[in-house]
Swiss-Prot record:
Stated role: Enzyme with broad specificity that catalyzes reversible hydroxyacid isomerizations via dehydration/hydration reactions. Catalyzes the isomerization between 2-isopropylmalate and 3-isopropylmalate, via the formation of 2-isopropylmaleate, a step involved in leucine biosynthesis. Catalyzes the isomerization between 2-methylmalate and 3-methylmalate, via the formation of 2-methylmaleate (citraconate), a step involved in isoleucine biosynthesis. Also displays malease activity, i.e. catalyzes the hydration of maleate to form (R)-malate.
Name listed for the protein in its UniProt record: Isopropylmalate/citramalate isomerase small subunit
E.C. code: 4.2.1.33, 4.2.1.35, 4.2.1.31
Domain of life: Archaea
pH-activity relationship: Optimum pH is 7.5.
Organism listed in the record: Methanocaldococcus jannaschii (strain ATCC 43067 / DSM 2661 / JAL-1 / JCM 10045 / NBRC 100440)
Entry keyword Amino-acid biosynthesis: yes
Membrane spanning residue stretches: none
Temperature dependence as stated in the record: Optimum temperature is 70 degrees Celsius.
Entries under CDD domains matching the protein: IPMI_Swivel
Length: 168
């Protein structure tokens, strides 16, 4: 996993719930590449046709609220979303995203400072977010080191497998 991510912004508002991220009728699918074809269709039905690998989602407050389904961050990862930045996250979504290896950063004021289509450069190690379109630099909350280790391993399961192998 790269610690510097560059991508185009897809912007969403406050209280984007897991049904907007991945509607419940698609929970019969479990593979990231299958889920990708339905991701964000609860908010924008054409999103899967428009999103490109490396793109970044910017959300408002309470992004990922609702049910605790792991399918939502898994679908975002399957669609090639490189990072999710929001004013705040629902805690269960935050944890599920880390568990599946999807980077995210909380950044107060991000909604007012970026527009859809802007290009961002995100430093996961420092939390610095550069809007390459406007030149503005924002400071997000950097992830704790142990969460960075989980992301670098590709998610919680690969991380645990690595740790178990190291201890033998």
């Amino acid at each position: 996993m790269r610690s510097i991510i560059k991508g185009r912004v897809w912007k969403f508002g406050n209280n984007v719930d897991t049904d907007a991220i991945l509607p419940a009728r698609y929970l019969v699918y479990t593979k990231p590449e299958e889920l990708a074809q339905f991701v964000m269709t609860g908010a924008d039905p054409d999103f899967p046709k428009k999103v490109k690998p490396g793109d970044i989602i910017v959300g408002g407050k309470n992004f990922g609220c609702g049910s605790s389904r792991e399918h939502a961050p898994l679908g975002l990862k399957g669609a090639g979303i490189s990072c999710v930045i929001a004013e705040s996250f629902a805690r269960i979504f935050y944890r599920n995203a880390i568990n599946v290896g999807l980077p995210l950063i909380e950044c107060k004021g991000i909604s007012e400072k970026v527009n859809e289509g802007d290009e961002l450069e995100v430093n996961l190690e420092t939390g610095e977010i550069k809007n390459l379109t406007t030149g503005e630099v924002l400071k997000g909350q950097k992830l704790p080191e142990f969460m960075m280790e989980i992301l670098e391993a590709g998610g919680l399961m690969p991380y645990l497998k690595k740790k178990m192998a190291e201890s033998q």
